[in-house]
C-alpha cells in the first residue's frame, strides 16, 4: 500500500533510494570505459574503473597519433577527477572498440569543458560520428554534458569519430563509455506509433539510433549512477509538472514484485517503481475528473521520439481498482490501462510501455494520465512512475546500424492517404456550396471567417484549391521570385527557426525587404497554420500586427512572406543575445504597442480572434522599435455572442499557457491576457518564462515574480539593466497589472483593453510621476471605454491610421485606437 507523502514521512522518503543498493549490478559482455587524456585510471561514482587512454591498454583504442591530452590546471574542488583531463582532436580522430557480442549497446560521451594553456574547450565546435553515422552535429558546450546513445551494432568494430566542424575548430571528449545493453532492452514488438485519431504499431525499433533526452523518476528523488543498475541518472519531475496541484507523491517501502515478461531492474531500478505521482483527489479546487500532465522540451520540432513510460501500481489496496488513460500530445495513446491485467494479476508489479510520438511545432512532448470511463467513481485515479524520452535520429542506411523505417512510413502514408482522399471530397462539396452562396456571403458582415482546422496530410492540389477558393490571388508570389530573393534559400540568411519551418531574410523584385517563412519541404503538417495565417492576415491591417506580403504554394511548397522586422523578436533584446538591453521607457512602449495589436485582434469583429501563442518571441520589433504581434498559426475565432468560451484542445507554449484553459480546455480572450502577463514579467525581469535549470521556486517566472510582488519586494528581481531608472510608482502599477493578468481564473483577469490603458498610465507615471494624483490612488485607473454612451453601438467605422494601416472596427471599440501623446 502506498501513502501520500507528508511531513512525518519526508525523511524516510528521501532516504528510500539508500535501501536498495545491494542487488547485483548488471555485467555487460562488452564493457569499455575510457578516461580520455589522462595518464592514470580512475573511478567514477561506483567501482567502475575508467582506463587511461595515454598508456596501455587504454591507448590501444585510439586510432590517431595526432590527438593531444590536456589537463585542467585549476580544477574545481567539486569536479570529478574524470573531468580534469580531456583528449583534444585538432584535425579529427577516433576510438575503435572490438565488439564481441552483436546487438544493442550504450554509448555515453562525457564533455566537461575547461581552459588549458593551449585550448579553451568552451570554444570547441565539432561533429561526432558512430561508424560513419552522424549523431552530433556542430556541437559546442560551456557546461558539463553527457550524451547517451542507444543503438544496435552489427559490425565487429565500433568506431567513434570526433571531427572539427571547420578548419579553425577542434573536438574533445573527457570520457567514453561503451557497453552492451541487457537482452531485449529495446524490443521490436508492441511499440505504439501515436498519431492523430489512432495508435498504430511502430516496427523495427531496435534498429533505430536513439539519443536519450529525458530520464525522469516521477514522484521520487534524483537517482545517480551509484544507485542505478545501468549507471544512469534519473532526475525529479517537479520542474516538468504543468499543474502541480493536480498531483501528489505516493511511495512504498516494499520491493517491486518483478514478473517474467515484465520490467526488470535493468529496465529501471527499484526506486523508480517504488515512487509515483497520483491524482490529488483531495484538492477541492479541481474538478472530479482531471489529468496529471507533464511537459518536456525536446528542442527538435516534428521529430519522432521513443517515449517509455514506467508503471507500478503502488496505490491500490487490491487488484482491479485502477483504470486510467494515457495521452501524448493530446492524442489518446492507451485507453483504459488496467495494470492488474497487464501484470497477470500481481499487485505492485512493474511494467513499461513504449510509444513512438512526434514532438509538436514548439519542440514539446506532453504526457498526461487521467481517469478512464471504467473507473469506479469512488476510486478515480491515475498514476505514473517514470518517463524516458529518446530522440529517434535520422533513418540509417549504414551496415553498422541496420534497419529502416519503411514500415513506419507505410503506416503513416496509408493513414494520411485516407485523409487526402476525404479532404479532396469535402473540398469539392465546399467549392460547389461556395459558388451557390457566393452572392449571399459577399453581402454579409465584414467579420473574419472562421478558421478551418485540417488533420493529417494533403498534397499541393488540396492546398491550392483551399487557398485559391478563398480569393487570395493578389497575394500570390512565385516560387522563382522567392528562390531568387533568398539566394536559393541560403542557410546563411536564416533569421529564425520555428515549428512550421525556417525563416529567411530576403527581398522581392522591387527590392522590398521581407521575411520568408518556408514550411518544411515535402511536409504538409503545417497546413492548418499556413491557412490560418493567410485567413487572418489577408483581412486585417494594423500598425501593431505583422503584415502579410504574400504566399506561395507552388511545387508543394507552403511559404508565407511578411514585412521584414529589422530588430527581430522582443526576447533577443531582453536576454540571451548580444543586443544592447532596452531602456525601461522602450520596454513600456513595446508592451503598449503589443497590447494595441492584441486589443485589435480581440475587438476587431463580432467574434474577435484569440491569438493563443502570445510570447516574447512572437512580438517583433521594426527598425524604430515599434512592436508588432506575429505568428497567427494557432489563432482561431473567439466565441459567438451568446457563448462564453470556445471548447478546443490545448495549444500554446510552455510557460505562457493559461492554467484555466489547460484544465478545462475552454478558450477565451483572457487566455491571451494571461500569456501577455507572463510577457510583462519577462520584460521586467529579463529571464525566460520557464527555466528548468533553476531551483524549484524559480522555475516558473510568473509564480516566482508574483511571490516577490506579494512580499512587496519585486524590485529585488528586476533586470539590473533598468533597476536604477524605474520610478517606484511606475514599477508598482506595472507589477499590479502583470499580476492581475496572471490570475488563476479568467474572470479575475482584466481585458486587454484595461491592460493597455494601465500600461499607458505606467508610462505617464514614469515620465512625470503621479502629478496631482495621491500616491495611494494611482494604482487604479478607469478605462475611458466606460464613457462611450455617446457613441452608437450599431455603427461601424473604418479607421485610417495615417501609416497605411486600416481595419473595420465597431464604434464601441474606437477608443482602442486612440494614441496617447503624453510621454511620447
Swiss-Prot record:
Residues 1-24 form the signal peptide. Glycans are attached at residues 6, 41, 204, 227, 291. The chain crosses the membrane at residues 407-427. It is found in: Membrane. SMART domains: S_TKc. The keyword Kinase applies. It is a single-pass type I membrane protein. This is Probable receptor-like protein kinase At5g24010. It comes from Arabidopsis thaliana (Mouse-ear cress).
Amino acid at each position: 500500500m502506498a501513502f501520500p507523502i507528508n511531513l512525518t514521512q519526508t525523511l524516510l522518503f528521501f532516504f528510500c533510494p539508500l535501501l536498495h543498493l545491494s542487488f547485483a549490478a548488471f555485467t555487460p559482455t562488452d564493457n569499455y570505459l575510457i578516461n580520455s587524456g589522462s595518464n592514470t585510471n580512475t573511478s567514477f561514482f561506483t567501482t567502475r574503473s575508467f582506463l587511461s587512454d595515454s598508456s596501455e591498454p587504454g591507448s590501444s583504442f585510439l586510432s590517431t597519433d595526432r590527438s593531444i591530452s590536456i589537463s585542467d590546471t585549476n580544477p574545481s574542488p567539486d569536479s570529478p577527477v574524470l573531468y580534469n583531463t580531456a583528449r583534444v582532436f585538432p584535425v579529427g580522430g577516433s576510438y575503435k572498440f572490438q565488439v564481441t557480442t552483436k546487438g544493442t549497446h550504450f554509448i555515453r560521451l562525457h564533455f566537461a569543458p575547461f581552459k588549458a594553456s593551449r585550448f579553451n574547450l568552451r570554444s570547441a565546435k565539432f561533429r561526432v560520428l558512430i561508424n560513419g553515422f552522424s549523431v552530433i552535429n556542430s556541437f559546442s558546450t560551456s557546461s558539463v554534458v553527457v550524451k547517451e546513445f542507444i543503438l544496435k551494432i552489427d559490425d565487429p568494430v565500433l568506431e567513434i569519430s570526433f571531427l572539427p566542424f571547420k578548419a579553425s575548430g577542434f573536438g574533445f571528449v573527457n570520457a567514453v563509455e561503451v557497453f552492451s545493453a541487457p537482452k531485449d532492452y529495446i524490443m521490436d514488438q508492441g511499440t505504439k506509433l501515436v498519431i492523430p485519431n489512432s495508435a498504430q504499431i511502430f516496427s523495427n525499433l531496435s534498429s533505430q539510433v536513439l539519443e536519450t533526452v529525458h530520464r525522469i523518476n516521477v514522484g521520487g528523488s534524483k537517482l545517480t549512477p551509484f544507485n542505478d543498475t545501468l549507471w544512469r541518472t534519473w532526475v525529479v519531475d517537479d520542474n516538468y509538472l504543468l499543474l502541480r496541484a493536480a498531483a501528489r507523491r505516493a511511495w512504498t517501502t516494499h520491493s517491486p514484485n518483478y514478473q517474467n515478461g515484465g520490467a526488470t531492474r535493468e529496465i529501471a531500478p527499484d526506486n523508480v517503481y517504488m515512487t509515483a505521482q497520483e491524482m490529488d483527489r483531495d484538492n477541492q479546487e479541481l474538478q472530479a475528473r482531471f489529468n496529471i500532465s507533464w511537459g518536456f522540451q525536446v528542442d527538435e520540432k516534428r521529430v519522432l521520439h521513443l517515449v517509455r513510460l514506467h508503471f507500478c501500481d503502488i496505490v491500490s489496496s487490491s487488484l482491479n481498482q485502477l483504470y486510467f488513460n494515457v495521452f501524448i500530445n493530446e492524442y489518446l495513446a492507451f485507453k483504459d490501462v488496467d495494470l492488474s491485467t497487464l501484470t497477470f494479476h500481481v499487485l505492485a508489479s512493474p511494467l513499461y510501455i513504449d510509444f513512438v510520438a512526434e514532438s509538436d511545432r514548439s519542440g514539446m512532448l506532453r504526457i498526461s494520465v487521467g481517469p478512464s470511463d471504467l473507473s469506479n467513481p469512488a476510486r478515480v485515479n491515475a498514476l505514473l512512475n517514470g518517463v524516458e524520452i529518446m530522440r529517434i535520429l535520422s533513418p540509417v542506411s549504414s551496415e553498422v546500424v541496420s534497419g529502416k523505417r519503411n514500415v513506419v512510413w507505410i503506416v503513416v502514408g496509408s493513414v494520411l492517404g485516407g485523409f487526402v482522399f476525404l479532404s479532396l471530397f469535402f473540398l469539392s462539396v465546399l467549392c460547389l456550396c461556395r459558388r451557390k452562396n457566393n452572392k449571399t456571403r459577399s453581402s454579409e458582415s465584414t467579420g473574419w471567417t472562421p478558421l478551418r482546422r485540417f488533420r493529417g496530410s494533403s498534397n499541393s492540389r488540396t492546398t491550392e484549391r483551399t487557398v485559391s477558393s478563398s480569393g487570395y490571388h493578389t497575394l500570390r508570389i512565385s516560387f522563382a521570385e522567392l528562390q531568387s530573393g533568398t539566394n536559393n534559400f541560403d542557410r546563411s540568411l536564416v533569421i529564425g527557426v520555428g515549428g512550421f519551418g525556417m525563416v529567411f531574410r530576403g527581398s522581392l523584385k522591387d527590392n522590398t525587404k521581407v521575411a520568408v517563412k518556408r514550411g518544411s519541404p515535402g511536409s504538409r503538417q503545417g497546413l492548418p497554420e499556413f491557412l490560418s495565417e493567410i485567413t487572418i492576415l489577408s483581412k486585417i491591417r494594423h500598425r501593431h500586427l505583422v503584415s502579410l506580403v504574400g504566399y506561395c504554394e507552388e511545387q508543394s511548397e507552403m511559404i508565407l512572406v511578411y514585412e521584414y522586422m529589422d530588430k527581430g523578436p522582443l526576447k533577443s533584446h531582453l536576454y540571451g543575445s548580444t543586443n544592447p538591453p532596452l531602456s525601461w521607457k522602450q520596454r513600456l512602449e513595446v508592451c503598449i504597442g503589443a497590447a494595441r495589436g492584441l486589443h485589435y485582434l480581440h475587438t476587431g469583429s463580432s467574434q474577435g480572434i484569440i491569438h493563443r501563442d502570445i510570447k516574447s518571441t512572437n512580438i517583433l520589433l521594426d527598425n524604430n522599435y515599434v512592436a508588432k504581434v506575429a505568428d497567427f498559426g494557432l489563432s482561431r475565432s473567439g466565441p459567438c455572442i451568446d457563448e462564453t468560451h470556445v471548447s478546443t484542445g490545448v495549444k500554446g507554449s510552455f510557460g505562457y499557457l493559461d492554467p484555466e484553459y489547460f484544465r478545462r480546455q475552454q478558450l477565451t480572450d483572457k487566455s491571451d491576457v494571461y500569456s501577455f502577463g507572463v510577457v510583462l514579467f519577462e520584460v521586467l525581469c529579463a529571464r525566460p518564462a520557464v527555466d528548468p535549470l533553476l531551483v524549484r521556486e524559480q522555475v516558473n517566472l510568473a509564480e516566482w515574480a508574483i511571490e516577490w510582488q506579494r512580499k512587496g519586494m519585486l524590485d529585488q528581481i528586476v533586470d539590473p539593466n533598468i533597476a536604477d531608472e524605474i520610478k517606484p510608482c511606475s514599477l508598482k502599477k506595472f507589477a499590479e497589472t502583470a499580476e492581475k493578468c496572471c490570475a488563476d481564473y479568467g474572470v479575475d483577469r482584466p481585458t486587454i483593453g484595461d491592460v493597455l490603458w494601465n500600461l499607458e498610465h505606467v508610462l505617464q507615471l514614469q515620465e512625470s510621476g503621479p502629478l496631482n494624483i495621491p500616491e495611494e490612488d494611482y494604482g487604479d485607473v478607469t478605462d475611458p471605454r466606460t464613457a462611450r454612451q455617446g457613441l452608437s453601438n450599431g455603427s461601424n467605422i473604418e479607421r485610417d491610421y495615417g501609416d497605411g494601416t486600416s481595419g473595420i472596427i465597431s464604434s464601441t471599440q474606437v477608443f482602442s485606437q486612440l494614441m496617447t501623446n503624453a510621454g511620447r
